[in-house]
């Protein structure tokens, strides 16, 4: 199983030579104003990844701010070509002559469905509507820029934590960890209830909204669960990937426990400002995830310790379920609180207003 270099150990695969909406969008009708995309005025870049760039934008008719995620079709075509070539190689039917055939196949699919490259992500986002999950408002096919753009809700509070380039923050207070993880559990419980798994839960994919609610973002690796609940192994961010994903003998694995493991790593990272399983190289880190026992600092709260041990159980059959998380002693404070959206919002806001 081949794994890409995780983003927190390498630079992003961003090609700055490709034009962006901000640098070369339709001309502004006013000086010192950003370019327009439909009714959205682009203000500044918020971030970027391998195939996308995210901008802050404002709807000129309502003055409401949004995040616009732009996908360059040239990058998407390269990614899709690589995926199809890998698939052909696995089937043993690829040869050098197939490259142009694959390109034609991709172009034909694009003509049939302009949103072909991000169809899976769009289909997932369309079924999700929850206060702790990113909301999709509009999709724009920009022929002018050869781009596909998602208009999403803007989260001005920033990330839960940034670990893509290493950890450089202090451990979060116990109550902050509790309130944060409560909302993450509510979000994932909803997502799983819709028959979806996220597959890339990590602090960088969890943002704060204006009201201090958490918002799970980036469903680029998400997928709908088959009826049997099993999925094929796939790449993600290695530090947050469950050990069963590194077992080459497994052709299919249970989907929901993958998200639970990633949630456990996320909780550990914000609680202790370090990874539960780490290594100097990717291979070293994978071996640690697969074989090393979980080590938790001695000062850890006893209920938090038990929760982490259950989330980071290497056997997915024994790993805590999302239903059990809703009743967990650490999150409910031993039954004092029920995990419901309304109760969590009030409690969480008070913590962050101290």
Curated annotation (Swiss-Prot):
Biological-process GO terms, alphabetical: cellular response to calcium ion; negative regulation of calcineurin-mediated signaling; negative regulation of TORC1 signaling; signal transduction
Gene Ontology molecular function, alphabetical: ATP binding; protein serine kinase activity; protein serine/threonine kinase activity
Subcellular location: Cytoplasm; Nucleus
Classification via PROSITE patterns: PROTEIN_KINASE_DOM, PROTEIN_KINASE_ST
SUPFAM superfamilies in UniProt: Protein kinase-like (PK-like)
Catalytic residues as annotated in Swiss-Prot or TrEMBL: 200
E.C. numbers: 2.7.11.1
Main location per the UniProt record: cytoplasm
Residues that, per the record, bind ATP: 46-54, 69
All copies of domain Protein kinase, residue ranges: 40-331
Record keyword Nuclease present: no
Key words of the record: ATP-binding, Cytoplasm, Kinase, Nucleotide-binding, Nucleus, Serine/threonine-protein kinase, Transferase
GO cellular component terms, A-Z: cytosol; nucleus
Catalytic activity: L-seryl-[protein] + ATP = O-phospho-L-seryl-[protein] + ADP + H(+); L-threonyl-[protein] + ATP = O-phospho-L-threonyl-[protein] + ADP + H(+)
Keyword NADP: no
PANTHER family, per the entry: CALCIUM/CALMODULIN-DEPENDENT PROTEIN KINASE KINASE-RELATED (PTHR43895), SERINE_THREONINE-PROTEIN KINASE STK11 (PTHR43895:SF150)
Family to which this protein belongs: Belongs to the protein kinase superfamily. Ser/Thr protein kinase family.
Name of the protein in question: Serine/threonine-protein kinase ppk34
Gene source species: Schizosaccharomyces pombe (strain 972 / ATCC 24843)
Phylogenetic classification of the source organism: Eukaryota, Fungi, Dikarya, Ascomycota, Taphrinomycotina
């Amino acid at each position: 199983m081949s794994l890409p270099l995780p983003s927190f150990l390498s630079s992003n695969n961003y090609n700055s030579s490709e034009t962006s909406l901000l640098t070369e969008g339709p001309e502004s009708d006013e000086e010192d104003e950003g370019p327009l995309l439909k009714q959205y005025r682009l203000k500044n870049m918020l971030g970027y990844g391998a195939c996308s760039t995210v901008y802050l934008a404002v709807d000129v008719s309502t003055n409401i701010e949004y995040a616009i995620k732009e996908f360059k079709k040239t990058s998407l075509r390269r990614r899709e070509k690589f995926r199809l070539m890998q698939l052909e190689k696995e089937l043993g039917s690829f040869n050098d002559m197939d490259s142009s055939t694959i390109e034609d196949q991709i172009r034909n699919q694009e003509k049939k469905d302009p949103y072909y490259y991000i169809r899976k992500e769009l289909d997932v986002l369309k079924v999700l509507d929850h206060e702790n999950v990113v909301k999709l408002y509009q999709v724009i096919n920009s022929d002018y820029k050869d781009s596909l753009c998602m208009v999403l809700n803007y989260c001005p509070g920033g990330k839960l934590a940034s670990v893509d380039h290493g950890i450089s923050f202090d451990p979060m207070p116990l109550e902050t960890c509790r309130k944060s993880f409560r909302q993450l559990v509510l979000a994932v419980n909803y997502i799983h209830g819709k028959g979806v798994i996220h597959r890339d839960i990590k602090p960088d994919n969890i943002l704060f909204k204006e009201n201090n609610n958490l918002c799970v973002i980036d469903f680029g690796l998400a997928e709908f669960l088959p009826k049997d609940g099993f999925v094929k192994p796939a790449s993600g961010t290695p530090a947050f990937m469950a050990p069963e994903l590194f077992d080459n003998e497994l052709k299919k694995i249970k989907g929901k426990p993958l998200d639970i493991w990633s949630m456990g790593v996320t909780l550990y990272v914000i609680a202790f400002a370090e990874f539960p399983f780490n290594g100097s190289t990717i291979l070293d880190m994978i071996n640690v995830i697969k074989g090393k026992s979980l080590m938790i600092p001695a000062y850890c709260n006893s209920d938090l310790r038990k929760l982490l041990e259950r989330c980071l159980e290497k056997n997915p059959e024994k790993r805590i379920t999302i239903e059990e998380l809703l009743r967990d002693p650490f999150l409910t404070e031993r039954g004092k609180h029920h995990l419901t959206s309304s109760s969590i919002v009030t409690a969480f806001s008070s913590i962050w207003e101290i």
